[in-house]
Regions:
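Conserved catalytic-site region of short-chain dehydrogenase/reductase
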Residues: 80, 114-119, 165-169
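Glycine/proline-rich active-site loop of Rossmann-fold NAD(P)-dependent oxidoreductases
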Residues: 153-154, 167-174, 204-213
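Substrate-positioning beta->alpha
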Residues: 140, 188-202, 213
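Conserved beta-loop-beta element that borders a ligand/cofactor-binding pocket
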Residues: 146-168
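Conserved Rossmann-fold NAD(P)-dependent oxidoreductase catalytic core, especially the SDR/UDP-sugar
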Residues: 30-32, 38, 93-136, 150-151, ...
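N-terminal Rossmann NAD(P)H-binding glycine-rich loop of SDR-like oxidoreductase domains
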Residues: 7-27
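Short, polar loop motifs at secondary-structure junctions
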Residues: 34-40, 163-164
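NAD(P)H-binding glycine-rich loop region in Rossmannoid oxidoreductase-like domains
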Residues: 39-94, 98-101, 205, 209
Length: 219
């Protein structure tokens, strides 16, 4: 398999997207950063190209993804968006179709923790835990993964679920990876820094170990 060099990063100016952008550039990837507001990206780097595009439009997604070795998406319509549930699912279906239309095979998605199991048969999003105002967005990511992405056979996708609590912190490089069960520490907390999450995602980009499946991270 040829090494991934050129990537498209959707949602590159957001909380997770900006961490992914920094990690990818620091590791020498050529990045096309796809954003709604290009002025939000202040980085200057010879390997960075910033493109304004509406990822809810199929042809715009396909055009911007053409020629890439892989597409990474950190798209989020905004936690305060009243239509976050519908928009998340609708736009991600468009992104997947655009990636296919562009002829790109590898797709890595910033997932949510909601679809992780916290006990046998019980997913976080069905447990009543977590802030209620975030539930529509959490459920949208979880249901997109369970109802759509898991059935996707045409492209080599990955859905990378963070720990339940992901915050700005430091890049330690010391974390654990898992599959469908939430990873918790010795006192039962599920947490990760966004910097370590980004490092693990770019590791997966550079050294693929997961194919058409979800994986997760935690300390």
């Amino acid at each position: 398999m040829e090494k991934v060099k050129k990537i498209v990063l959707i949602g590159a100016s957001g909380f997770v997207g900006s961490a992914l952008l920094n990690e990818a550039l620091n590791r020498g990837f050529e990045v096309t950063a796809v954003v709604r507001n290009p002025e939000k990206i202040k980085i200057e780097n010879e390997n960075l190209k910033v493109v304004k595009a509406d990822v809810a439009v199929l042809d715009e997604v396909a055009d911007v993804c053409k020629g890439a070795d892989a597409v990474v998406s950190a798209f989020n319509p905004g936690w305060n968006n009243p239509d976050i549930y519908d928009e998340t699912i609708k736009v991600y279906l468009t992104i997947i179709d655009g990636v296919k239309k562009a002829g790109v095979n590898r797709f890595l998605m910033v997932g949510g923790a909601g679809s992780l199991f916290i006990a046998p048969g019980l997913r976080l999003m069905d447990s009543g835990e977590g802030p209620e105002n975030r539930l529509p967005g959490v459920k949208a990511l979880g249901e997109f993964y369970l109802n759509f992405l898991k059935k996707e056979k045409e492209i080599d996708w990955v859905f990378f679920s963070p720990a339940a609590d992901m915050r700005p912190g430091v890049r330690t490089g010391r974390y654990r990876l898992g599959k469908d069960d939430m990873i918790v520490d010795i006192v039962g907390n599920s947490h990760i820094s966004v910097e370590d999450y980004a490092a693990a995602m770019i590791d997966e980009l550079e050294y693929p170990k997961h194919h058409q499946e979800r994986f997760t991270i935690g300390y």
